[in-house]
Structures are given as C-alpha cells and as structure tokens.
Regions:
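Conserved catalytic-core motifs of GNAT/GCN5-like acyltransferases
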Residues: 68-73
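Glycine-centered, phosphate/nucleic-acid-interacting loop/turn motifs that mediate DNA/RNA or nucleotide
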Residues: 64
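Basic amphipathic alpha-helical segments that dock to polyanions
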Residues: 53-60
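C-terminal regulatory/oligomerization modules of transcriptional regulators
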Residues: 1-8, 67, 97-129
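N-terminal helix-turn-helix DNA-binding core of bacterial DNA-binding proteins
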Residues: 9-52
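Basic, amphipathic "hinge/linker" alpha-helix immediately C-terminal to the N-terminal HTH DNA-binding motif
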Residues: 74-96
Length: 129
C-alpha cells in the first residue's frame, strides 16, 4: 500500500505548479486560501502540504511567474498574497499544453494495454432484458 501512495504523490508532484497557477489565474490569493480551495475543489483528493506549497510559490515568484505582496490583516498579522504575472500566464499555457499531451498519451497507452480476456476466460456482460 505504501508503494501506491508514493506513486500517487509522484504524479501529484508533477502538477503542483500547474494547479497553483490555475488557482491564481483570476485573482490574488494567500497560501492557506490556496490550499483550502485546492482541497475543496478536488473533494479532498489533492492536498498540498505547506512544506511543498510555499517552496513552490517561492520558486514561481523567483522565476517571474508570480508577484507577491504582503498585506496587513488585523493588528499584528500580515499575509502574503500571490498574483500571476504575464510571464506566469505564458508558463501556465505551456504547462496546460504539456499536461494535455502527457495525459492524452497515457490514455492511449492505457487503451492499447488494457487487459483482454484469454480464450475461455469468463467475462461478465450486461444483459439486455
């Protein structure tokens, strides 16, 4: 079971930048807001830990794909809000194209390698009654 979980996390790791940019494409958001929206939109299937999310946001900012701005919240707290840049929109378009190509290729591979029953093997079919 642990091996399956690790594989699932490997797939997710490759989509973190894409998902964060998708969530930021329409408005500024802060880190906790991003993680909550991501979990909610994915029905809890895509959780992003702070230890993964913040370094990714930092890297996207360093690469010019995001801008960050500190805003005061309440008396003593500040939040860092992230906003996608024009370079970020270009990068997002590139990531979406890559994702579409890869998932399309994987779908084709899955279709071609689907298990086909051997002769004499029982295959359940739906009855048309």
């Amino acid at each position: 079971m642990a091996k399956q979980i690790r594989n699932k996390n490997n797939i997710k790791h490759g989509t973190i930048e894409l998902v964060l940019l998708l969530l930021l494409q329409n408005e500024q958001k802060y880190g906790y807001q991003l993680s909550q929206e991501l979990e909610e939109m994915s029905d809890g299937k895509y959780e992003l830990k702070e230890t993964t999310m913040y370094p990714t946001l930092y890297r996207l900012t360093q690469n010019g794909y995001l801008d960050s701005e500190q805003k005061k919240v309440g008396v003593r707290r500040t939040r860092v809000y992230y906003e996608i840049t024009s370079e970020g929109y270009k990068y997002l378009t590139h990531l979406k194209q890559e994702y579409t190509l890869i998932t399309g290729a994987i779908d084709k591979i899955m279709e071609h390698t689907a298990h086909k029953p051997d002769e004499g093997e029982y295959v359940e079919t739906k009855s048309h009654t």
